[in-house]
Amino acid sequence: MAQYTIECVETRTEADNGQYGKFVLEPLERGQGTTLGNALRRVLLSNLEGTAVTAVRITGVNHEFATMKGIREDVLDILLNMKELVLRSYTSDIQIGRLAVQGPKRVTAADLELPTEVQVVHPRHYIATLAEDGQLEMEFQIERGKGYRAIERGSEDGAAIDYLSIDAIFMPVRKVNWTVESERSAANVEQDRLTLEIWTSGSLSPQEALSQAAKILVDQLRPLQEITFEPPAEPQRSAPNTVGQVPIEELQLSVRAYNCLKRAQINTVADLLEYTEEDLLEIKNFGQKSAEEVIEALQDKMGLSLPKDKPARS
C-alpha cells in the first residue's frame, strides 16, 4: 500500500470567523495527485452537512415585500441577513430559534435565542437596525442539510402558513483549491505533491472538513472491495433430442423397408442401432436392397452406421 504524509502547513481565522487551512500530501504515485485532488474537492463542496435557517416568521408580517415601522431594513433584507447566518448544529432534528428586541438597537446574531444544540459561529453577524420606536419579534427554523436548497414557490413544505421560506445554503465549505506538482524521489522516480487549500464558513474547521470528506469517499468505495462477481446464469436449454427419440419415419424409407422394420418392432433409430446388417437380413421379407437402403439413410440423414457386431444388451 502506498504511504504518504499529510501536513497542515498553514491555518488562519478570517475576520468573519471563517477558517482557512492549507494541506500538503506527499509523496503520491504519479497521477494520484489529480485523482485525490479532484475527488476531495467535489466531496468537500457538495457532500458535507451544514446548518442553515430555512424559514422565518416575523410578528406582524405576512409577506416578504413588507416594511416595518422603526426598522431600517425591509423584510427582504432581514431574510437575506438570516440566510447568511452561520450556525453549527449538534443534532439532526429541526430546531427553533427566537429573537425579541426593542429599539434603539443594532441587532446581531449575539441577540438570537438559540437551542442548546445550536451555536452561532459569528456573533457579530448583522441582522437589522432598530430606531427608538422599532420592535422586532421573530421565530426561525434551523435545519441540517447538504448543498443548496432553493425554495419552491407556492410550497411551504408543511411549515406554518405565516413562515417565510428561505433558500438555504448548507455548505460549510466555501471554496477549495488544489494543485499538483511533480517531483523526483531519491530513486529518481517521478511522484506527485498535492496541495489542498480549504476555506470554510467556520461551522467546520478545514481539518474536520477534510476528515469528513475522506470518510465519505472511503464509505463509497468500500463496497467495491467486497464485491463478488458471479458469471451470469446460462439460460436453461431444453435437452436436445437423443438418437433414441428419433422415429424411423425421419429416415424416409421405402414403404417395403419401413413396414418390415415396423413389423419387427423397430420404431426408433435407437432400436435400429441394436441390429447389424446380418440381423436385418433375417427379418422376414427384408432383403439386401432394403438393408442397403437403411444403411444409406442412416449415414445421409443421421451420420450413423449400423454396428458391425450385435451390441451387448444390458
UniProtKB/Swiss-Prot annotation:
Catalysed reaction, written as an equation: RNA(n) + a ribonucleoside 5'-triphosphate = RNA(n+1) + diphosphate
GO MF term list: DNA binding; DNA-directed RNA polymerase activity; protein dimerization activity
Gene Ontology CC: one annotated term: DNA-directed RNA polymerase complex
CDD domains: RNAP_alpha_NTD
Disulfide bond entries: none
Span list, region Alpha C-terminal domain (alpha-CTD): 241-314
Keywords: DNA-directed RNA polymerase, Nucleotidyltransferase, Transcription, Transferase
One GO term of the biological process aspect: DNA-templated transcription
Pfam families reported for this sequence: RNA_pol_A_bac, RNA_pol_A_CTD, RNA_pol_L
Start and end residues of each stretch annotated as Alpha N-terminal domain (alpha-NTD): 1-228
EC number: 2.7.7.6
Domain remarks: The N-terminal domain is essential for RNAP assembly and basal transcription, whereas the C-terminal domain is involved in interaction with transcriptional regulators and with upstream promoter elements.
Summary of the function given for this chain in its UniProt record: DNA-dependent RNA polymerase catalyzes the transcription of DNA into RNA using the four ribonucleoside triphosphates as substrates.
Family that this chain belongs to: Belongs to the RNA polymerase alpha chain family.
Subunit structure of this chain's protein: In cyanobacteria the RNAP catalytic core is composed of 2 alpha, 1 beta, 1 beta', 1 gamma and 1 omega subunit. When a sigma factor is associated with the core the holoenzyme is formed, which can initiate transcription.
Name this protein carries in UniProt: DNA-directed RNA polymerase subunit alpha
Taxonomic source organism: Gloeobacter violaceus (strain ATCC 29082 / PCC 7421)
